[in-house]
């Protein structure tokens, strides 16, 4: 593909508020070849002009696992999955609080509580609304919750309890959605994000790349999410879990994953772009390059899949001279 856009100039125009990236320019990034490293340099320049070498650390707690009535093809917790995972109800409040303390001591700024299922029960919401203030009172942590298709009343209760952010990913382009899940729709996810916004709670929403989406579909999805004005954008790359419909699915290359992140850096220049699940698998020797492009990442494990040892993560970030909250790991 011939080189058409001067991306350093585009980055300067974005920083000055004069323009934003177009659909065509985003597609040019994904299709780039001989000019690719110039584009990467421009994306890195854009990131550094906004947030320098700072990176925020998130820790994820799987607080309720398995037992889900949804049929998401990527998920080991869905009703269709035969993956060998532990299944349990909502963890006791003292266990959640203890894990929040560990997250803080290990340097996290954000504690992410994840619950499987379509949406929480009344009792589960009550439990969350008890433990959230306890965490906020004890620790300087932001709390993000992922708990399915929360209704307006549940969101209001969580807002009153002090929740900082709700995660609800769009996951995959609308045209690809029926290939991934049929127990709910892409519109259901968009409607949930609208309800979160209406309660004046910050939105965390992103993608799972590598589930059969086209380049054009992924860019359309990114621009659709931009309209919904998320606070943070977690970008996952499919962890193909044995026992799920997508358990043997993998067509992404490390360079394609890096191009996706560079494209998203341009689409979301002033938002918190987060490197999430799959980074250890998909980027191979490019992991340092992608880490330099983002504003935050996860320490340790994901939901049912193990990540990297937290000490190793911290050492990796320090070798890159990225500024994170430096606390003694326990």
Swiss-Prot record:
Pfam families: BATS, Radical_SAM. [4Fe-4S] cluster binds at residues 68, 72, 75. It is an enzyme of class 2 (transferase). InterPro entries: Aldolase_TIM, BATS_dom, Biotin_synth/BioAB, Biotin_synthase, Elp3/MiaA/NifB-like_rSAM, rSAM. Residues 53-276 form the Radical SAM core domain. Pathway: Cofactor biosynthesis; biotin biosynthesis; biotin from 7,8-diaminononanoate: step 2/2. It comes from the Bacteria. Keywords: 2Fe-2S, 4Fe-4S, Biotin biosynthesis, Iron, Iron-sulfur, Metal-binding, S-adenosyl-L-methionine, Transferase. Its EC number is 2.8.1.6. Binds 1 [4Fe-4S] cluster. The cluster is coordinated with 3 cysteines and an exchangeable S-adenosyl-L-methionine. The keyword Metal-binding applies. SUPFAM superfamilies: Radical SAM enzymes. Gene3D superfamilies: Aldolase class I (3.20.20.70). GO terms for molecular function: 2 iron, 2 sulfur cluster binding; 4 iron, 4 sulfur cluster binding; biotin synthase activity; iron ion binding. One of its GO terms (biological process) is biotin biosynthetic process. The keyword Protein biosynthesis does not apply. [2Fe-2S] cluster binds at residues 112, 144, 204, 274. Its cofactor is [4Fe-4S] cluster; [2Fe-2S] cluster. Catalyzes the conversion of dethiobiotin (DTB) to biotin by the insertion of a sulfur atom into dethiobiotin via a radical-based mechanism. Homodimer. Belongs to the radical SAM superfamily. Biotin synthase family. This is Biotin synthase.
């Amino acid at each position: 593909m011939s080189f058409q856009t001067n991306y350093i100039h585009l980055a300067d125009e974005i920083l000055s508020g004069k323009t934003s990236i177009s659909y065509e320019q985003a597609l040019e990034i994904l299709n780039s070849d001989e000019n690719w490293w110039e584009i990467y340099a421009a994306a890195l320049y854009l990131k550094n002009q906004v947030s320098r070498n700072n990176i925020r650390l998130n820790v994820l707690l799987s607080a309720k696992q398995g037992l889900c009535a949804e049929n998401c093809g990527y998920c080991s917790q869905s009703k269709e999955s035969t993956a060998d995972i532990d299944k349990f109800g909502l963890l006791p409040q003292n266990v959640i609080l203890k894990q929040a303390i560990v997250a803080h001591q290990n340097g996290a700024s954000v504690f992410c509580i994840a619950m499987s299922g379509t949406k929480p029960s009344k009792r589960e919401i009550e439990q969350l609304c008890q433990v959230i203030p306890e965490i906020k009172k004890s620790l300087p942590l932001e709390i993000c919750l992922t708990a399915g298709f929360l209704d307006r009343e549940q969101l209001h209760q969580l807002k009153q309890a002090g929740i900082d952010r709700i995660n609800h990913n769009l996951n995959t382009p609308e045209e690809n959605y029926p290939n991934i899940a049929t127990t709910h729709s892409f519109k259901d996810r968009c409607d949930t994000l609208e309800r979160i916004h209406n309660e004046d709670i910050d939105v965390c929403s992103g993608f799972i790349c590598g589930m059969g989406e086209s380049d054009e579909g992924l860019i359309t999805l990114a621009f659709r999410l931009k309209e919904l004005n998320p606070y943070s954008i977690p970008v996952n790359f499919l962890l193909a879990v044995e026992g799920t419909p997508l358990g043997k699915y993998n067509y992404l290359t490390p360079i394609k994953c890096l191009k996706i992140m560079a494209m998203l850096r341009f689409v979301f220049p002033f938002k918190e772009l987060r490197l999430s699940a799959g980074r250890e698998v998909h980027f191979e020797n490019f992991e340092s390059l992608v880490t330099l492009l983002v504003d935050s990442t996860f320490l340790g494990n994901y939901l049912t899949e193990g990540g990297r040892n937290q000490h190793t993560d911290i050492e990796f970030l320090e070798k890159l001279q990225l500024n994170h909250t430096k606390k003694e790991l326990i």
